Amino acid sequence: MTPRMALLQTLEHLDALDPDHLPVVPLDAYFTGNDQEESIAPNQWEFGRPPIGELYARFQAIAARPDVQGVYVGLHQDWGMALEDDTEWPAAENIHILTCADEPTVLSWLDGLESDGASTGWPYGQHAAAPVPAEGFQVFSVFWD
């Protein structure tokens, strides 16, 4: 099974589990095999956002930090379009970082990614299968316009 098909299968399962909230998947599940530059932050692609491979590497480095519990990708409401088009990767809306770091520190990790910042919490509500931050940790959601 290709990484794309595995991701779509996971997304369909998550959607059935909690259709009222957008699915959240681990960083590697979203980026492995993904070479579609416009699958995340399409409005910043070619306007300063690094290539998708570099974006992935940057978030992998963040995920490896000792003050980070995990990094996850929040899907866009139109992710299901990829079910109808074999050439499309499911669209992502944001990146969620579970960390005990403070906001200025988190924002410093995002330098050069052309994001519009990070807010605390799940912007569209927490999916039933989304990870729960450990005690002393919180969710920062990185977003792009």
Give residue spans per PLM region.
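Long, contiguous N-terminal structural blocks used for assembly/anchoring
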Residues: 1-96, 105-109
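Intrinsically disordered, low-complexity regions enriched in Ser/Pro/Gly/Gln/His and often acidic
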Residues: 38, 102, 135-137
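Structural alpha-beta junctions
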Residues: 64-70, 101-105, 112-124
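A generic structural motif
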Residues: 93-98, 140-142
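Acidic, proline/glycine-rich low-complexity IDRs
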Residues: 113-145
